Amino acid sequence: MAKETPIQNTFDGGELSPLLGGRTDLAKYFNGCSVLENFLPAVQGPLVRRGGTQFINAKKTAEQGWLVRFQVSERVAYMLEFGDQYIRFYTDRGLLVDGGSPVEVATPYTTADLTAEDGTCAIRVVQSADVMYIFHGRFQTRKLQRLSATSFSLDLAEFTEGPFDDVNTDESVTVTTDAETGPVNLTASADIFLPEHVGTLFYLETADLSAVRPWGVYQTMSVGQRRRVDNRVYQCTTVGPTNSEGAPVTGNQTPIHTEGKAWDGDGRPITGDQRGSIGVEWEFLHAGYGIVKITAVTDGQHATGTVVKRLPSELQPGGGGSTTVTDFPISSMAPGSSSSRIEVSAPGHPFLDGNPIVITGTILFDSDGMGSNTNRNGSYIVRDRGANSYEIDASWPGPSYVYSPSSNGKATRTITVTYPSNAPTWKWAFSLFSDDTGWPEHGAFWRERLVLVRGRKVAMSVTGDFENFANKSAGGEVEADSGIVVTLNARQVNRAVWVVESDDLVIGTDGDEWLVGPIQSNQAVGPANIRADRRTAYGSRSIQPVEIGSKILFIQASGRRLRDYEYSYDTNNYVSVDTTKLASHMLRTGAVDMAYQQEPDSIVWVARADGQLVGCTYDQETGRSDVYAWHPHPMINGAVEAVETMPAPDGSADDLWMIVRREIDGQTVRYVELLRPPLGDNEDQAEAFYVDCGLTYRGDPAATISGLGHLEGQEVDILTDGAAHPRRTVSGGQVSLQIEASIVHVGLPTSCAAATMSLEAGAANGTAQGKLKRLTNVIARLYRSLGGNLGPTRDNTETLNFRRPSRPMGSPPPLFSGDTEPIPWRGGYERSARIWYTNDQPLPVTLLALLSVVSTNDDR
């Protein structure tokens, strides 16, 4: 009979699939376990018992909810509890209160809204400092703002100038308007408007600007006329004075402004050039398009709205028009150049020859006192214009009449410019997101842009202006920093389910994975420098991935695989590894939530659809480390429904938060709980926290522990000053102790268990599998541990003894480091030998190695 002394000194293979029970050819067979419960495989190799869960607070309502991290900085972070139309806040491992009341904001999301059809969270968020955008496919995007340490607000995110869907291409479906600014009526030639469009933006662009003549140098110009430069349309608001050489003309400085007014010359004449003053003032009107916010829909062809970006008058059926009224005072009147003319003195007046004017307020009186006062009020045409006077067609009443100093005479010019009739425009577009098409489901900050994603559409804001989605500049040009809309075009109509910002924007859909980035990598991302490439076809579940170093880890579409995703320079493409390949049973019921805990160990935590919490210790460094060890964490009377991480208050580690469903005192409750870290090397034994849904009493020695109403009627484990205490049942929110204690941890019992794979050792001829073998001298190598059992099966174990005769019976044995004494092995000869370690006391365990002597009979 051959004899061997094997050692399993690393457990970083985690719990392996039962399908690997015969794969002794795999290296991880010797690092893995057939059973691994409530242990954390450390990247260094040992198994460390997980800490217990600390009760933080009962969820506001008993319905399902979700957790979201709001991290302002490394030391300022909040955990958000999303529930039935509310958000609650946690910080410093407790509920955030202000004035004795929980800090809370109201939301539109009901319990049903918060959970997607596949059981995952329907909410996505993206954060920048004190602002968090909240996305839900059925609700307009919200903006959560941190106003102070205890004050938050939730408002609609009002995106400006877009984003818009594709511009209509059916020239038979047109839209007209009846105003350029303010309230406006929209009339369509077909049924295009829906009640769901109310509150969204509507884009209109002129199909034809030929009615507006191009601006040119030295064009005769009058107030009210319009000209265009490219697609920019301007209106003349002021001209220079008319002189004897001609009327005012445009200058030689092409208008380029896109707001307000500017002159194209200095407005002064040049003697001898046969022109009037050179240069007029231009007001910028529009760049060939405008935007309306729809306020009401009458029917499919009629809607009303408010203009938020001036509309071109060319969108109006009659072409629109403008009216300019100019008043100018009259200083005096006198006989004119003929008996049928009167000269009107008005220094600096703006009127031109031929202008119609209306004169009011004049008084002519007879200086001899013989005649009655009269006037020359009425409508006239300006004649023989001069810089300081002009004439009108009227006769002077007599040689003794003069213009009265008490007159309030003035002349009023009214110029109405009517533009040619226009064809209705077919260039219109609805908002990309609305109650009709749905709202953004995902977001990201990438390349100084806010990215909104829904379905196959990806919209990007103006660079550096996160809420502005204008796809053109104010002058109508598409520029490098303009807003962008990209469509993920593929054979299948797959829906985006996650977005991760990296060098490229990585988008996972339910059928494939995409990269969105610049065509020319040495140039800025812009409308003319953007690409969307389909790279792989794994497909994903709607769970936000986690990032570990340069890798992205996502749940595959079935919910039963966790894949890592990383760019490979060898293949010039992204490559993926199925981390559940060796533990395919671990996500068998499907994942519903996921979080990453970077410190103290690199662990991906997953909440399964059946309420099981599982983890994957992940440490991948090419040529150095190849750890992806899965480990389940069953709970007594507990189903984990949501997980999230945030930095611990002291920043030394990441805390895993969870919402746990439990049955307490005959009622279904949901608690917010926090996974406590294992006992640290610098912590006293009394600080060991290995109970679930637990609380800690710390104070003067006490024999009764109260404040346990959240565990009413439950049998609980107790650790008193580092010693395991007999279990008690909570009654009236309290338990009684056998002896007084100063540090007491009370909570639901937990247990841990680890079982090796079928041992492959001791055979002199070939494999040991299937051969009779016997184990003796089984030893556990432990570090700062206490309690536990060893045996051939879970239910057939021998208790390890750590109490020494020199230790007083009234005090707990100290934590043990070293090799346990060999125990009587309860197993006999067997063909599939395993070593089990179990511990059902609330005590710390770090299992470094399992050692044994294996005698194998080679006769089979």
For every predicted segment, state its role.
Residues Y86-Y90, L515, I519, G787-R804:
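Short, surface-exposed beta-strand/strand-loop-strand elements in extracellular ectodomains
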Residues L47-R50, T61-E63, S101-Q127, D178-N185, ...:
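Short linear interaction motifs
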Residues E4-G21, A27, S101-I123, F159-A179, ...:
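Small/polar beta-strand repeat architecture
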Residues P108-V126, G438-W439, S736-Q738, S806-P842, ...:
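Beta-sandwich interaction modules
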Residues T750-G788, P792-L800, A849-L850, T856-R860:
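Glycine/proline-rich low-complexity spacer/linker segments in large multi-domain proteins
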Residues T120-V125, G443, R449, K457, ...:
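Beta-sheet-dominated scaffold domains
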Residues M1-P102, K143, L147-P183, T306, ...:
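N-terminal beta-propeller domains
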Residues Y78, F82, T107-K143, I507-G508:
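Elongated alpha-helical scaffolds
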